[in-house]
Amino acid sequence: MRTVQYREALNEAMSEEMRRDPSVFLMGEEVAEYDGAYKVSKGMLAEFGPKRIIDTPISELGFSAIGVGAAMNGLRPIVEFMTWNFAILAADQIINHAAKMLQMSGGQFHVPIVFRGGNGSAGQLAATHSQSFEAMYANIPGLKVVTPSTPYDAKGLLKSAIRDDDPVLVMESERMYGDKGEIPDGEYLVPIGVAHVARKGTDVTIVSFGKMMKVALAAAEELQKEGVNAEVIDLRTIRPLDTATIIASVRKTNRLVVVDENFPMVSIASEVAYRVQKDAFDFLDAPVLRINQADTPLPFSPPLIEASLPNPARVIAAVKEVMYLVK
């Protein structure tokens, strides 16, 4: 095992897959000469050249359309968005073309494309650069959505995404690119659609994903000091959702709290709560609670940002509520 940064894990995934498969290429704003806005593609231009590491104009709709067309014609594009907030401009290509082409062509055209980039809050970037989009895209049949929370998952999930024959959206985070973690020396894959029990416990289940896993795990450690043993599940994939792992945990702990950076209306937490009450209602000893971002555009002010986003204190309070520890 060796320690790498999250950005380095993504870089290794893309580089390994490009060496393995000449049909794989990377395109996006500043991915070549500048090594990527967050240095994820550092050194790749020198190794693979300008025909496979392609700087694009500032036109998300345009280069996403090129990517979809290339995928329909036998290539495996990786399209990098500087942020998923900018991908709103490319939503027509992602939702109406990449997601639907296999069905609309009667199975004639797969679209093996990866869309990836930073997602969610990232410091004081304010309302238009701080949105979480997992729930929006997970609502679209034909798309797969993954949210790696560690360098290990970032590399393994991205490699699986590149090899997938259907469109996969990889939701990263600007706040995680510098995070460090261990990965194996040899090749490995993390399967799409399989959650991970990041912390075993017996008293309550906490489900989260992406950078909110830091919040969930921090809350679990504080709860342990008070004698509450929380099990923490990292979804890793949002669509398809690994309901079985969640249900198995809830059957053991009988309580569930979901931590989700998306807005509360029609969120990932909403879907998890529905599936648990549908398939494990008789095992619940308390209502499912969820911790979401406040139902308002994210402010610029640091105190208001802190008040808007999920944090360990809010998770701890929710856990105590489902365990009836609140006086």
Q: Which residues fall in each region the model found?
A:
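Thiamine diphosphate
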Residues: M1-M171, E174-K327
